[in-house]
Amino acid sequence: MDLNDLLLQQQEVTNLLSNLQEAHKRILISNEDENNDLNKIRKDILICLNDLKTVNSLIIDPRDGLIKKNLHKLEKYEQELRSLESEEAAIESNLNQWKIDQDPENVRRKENWGTVPINLVGNHQYLLESYVNEVGIENTTLANTNGNHEETPNSSKFTREQLLRNARKLKLCQEQVNSEIDQLKSLISQYERDRNVINDEYNRTTELIQKEVNTLSREEDKINSQREKILKKLGLLKDHEQNQPRNFFFSLGALARVDNSDFKIALSQAYEFIDAKKQALKKILHENKSQTMSLEHNFSIWNDVIRSIQGLETNLQQSFIEKEGNVPKTDITSMISRTLSRVNSIVGTYSKDSIFTSILCELKALQKALDELNGKMQPIPIKSSAKTPELLQMGKSPPKVALSKEYASNLHESTEDFPLKINKTD
C-alpha cells in the first residue's frame, strides 16, 4: 500500500472515531431506547482503535514499515541522481576534449611552423629591370598612361644595334616570364590537388569526431532520461502516462510542483525536495512512534471497559431471566457498583487521549443508573440487548475501515460531512 493512501486512511479512521464517540456520547445522555445502536457503536469504536493501532504498526515497523521503505526509496533516488551527476560530469569532460580548436593560429603556434619558400627557375624581373634602366622608363609603355602604343618622341634616339639588342633581351624576358607562369600554374594545380585532399581528409576526420561526440551525447540523453524517470517518481515532473494526478496527503508548500517542460528547474530542486521530504517522513515517523503506546493502551482499556459493561449486561439479563424480571434493587445496584469499581480500576489515573472521554461517559452513565436506583423503591426493568450485528472486520494488510452495515445507515446525521466507506477485503 502507498504511504499517502495509508496516511489518508489513518485520517479517515481518526475522523470516523471522532464521529463514533460523538454518537456514543449522544446515545448515553439521551433518554431514547437505543441500546442496540450503543452496543454497535462500542464495538465500532474498538474496531477503529484496532485499525489505528494496525495503521501505526504499518507506518513505523522497523523492518518493512512504509516510512522506512519510503526513506530507503528517497535515499536510493538521491544516490542515483548523484551517480548520474558524476557520469554527466565525466561525459562533459570527454565532450570538451573532442572540441576542435577553431583558431588556426593556436595550432600554428603549437606546431611551430616555419615558412616554405617558392623557388622559380629564371628571373624575368631582372631582365625587365635591366631593359627599363637601359632605355629609360620614359621611353617605355610604363610611361604611357593613356595606353597608346604609338612610337614615343624619344624612340628615334636608339640606334639599330640598340634596338636589336633590346629586342633580344625582351624576347628572352618574354620566354622567361612565360616559363615562370607555367611553373606557377603547375604549383597552383598541385596546391589545388592538395587542397582537395585536405578537404576530404578534414571532412572524414570531423565525421569521425562527430560520431564520438554523438555517442557521448546519446549517453548524456540516457542520463537525462533516467533523471526524468526519477523526477517523475518524486513527483517533481508530471507523468503524462498517468490519467489521474496523484494527491499527496502531506504537502511541502515551500517547494512548488513544476511543469513537465521545466526539466532543469525540477532537477535543480531535486536534492532540496528529497531532503525536505525525508524530514517530513521522519516527523511523521516520530509522531506515530510517540502514539504507539497510547494506541495500544487505548485499545486495551476500551476493550476491558466494554467487556466489563457487556458482562454487566449479560449478568443483568441472566438475573432477569432466572427471576422472571423480579430482580431486587440491591442485586442490581451491587452488580452496577462492582462494574463501576472495575471500570475505575481499569482506567486508574489514565486521562489521556480522546478515548478517555468515551470511558468517562460510560462511568457517568453507570453512576447515573446507580443514583437513580438508590432513589427508587421498586426494581427497574432493564431490557436485554439484542444480538449485535456482525461487523466487517479489518484485514491484516492493507488495513480497511471496519463498519457495521446497520451503523453506516443509522448514523447519517452525525456523519453527514464524512462519507463512510466499506472496503471489501481483497
From Swiss-Prot:
Gene designation: ATG23
A GO CC term assigned to this protein in UniProt: membrane
Membership in a protein family: Belongs to the ATG23 family.
This protein's record includes keyword Membrane: yes
Record's function text: Required for cytoplasm to vacuole transport (Cvt) vesicle formation and efficient autophagy. Plays a role in ATG protein retrieval from the pre-autophagosomal structure (PAS) and is especially required for autophagy-dependent cycling of ATG9. Also plays a role in regulation of filamentous growth.
Domain of life: Eukaryota
Entry protein name: Autophagy-related protein 23
Membrane topology according to the record: Peripheral membrane protein
UniProt lineage: Eukaryota, Fungi, Dikarya, Ascomycota, Saccharomycotina
Keywords of the record: Autophagy, Coiled coil, Cytoplasm, Membrane, Protein transport, Transport
Organism in which the protein naturally occurs: Kluyveromyces lactis (strain ATCC 8585 / CBS 2359 / DSM 70799 / NBRC 1267 / NRRL Y-1140 / WM37) (Yeast)
One record GO biological process: protein transport
Coiled coil start-end: 64-101, 165-230
Subcellular location: Cytoplasm; Membrane
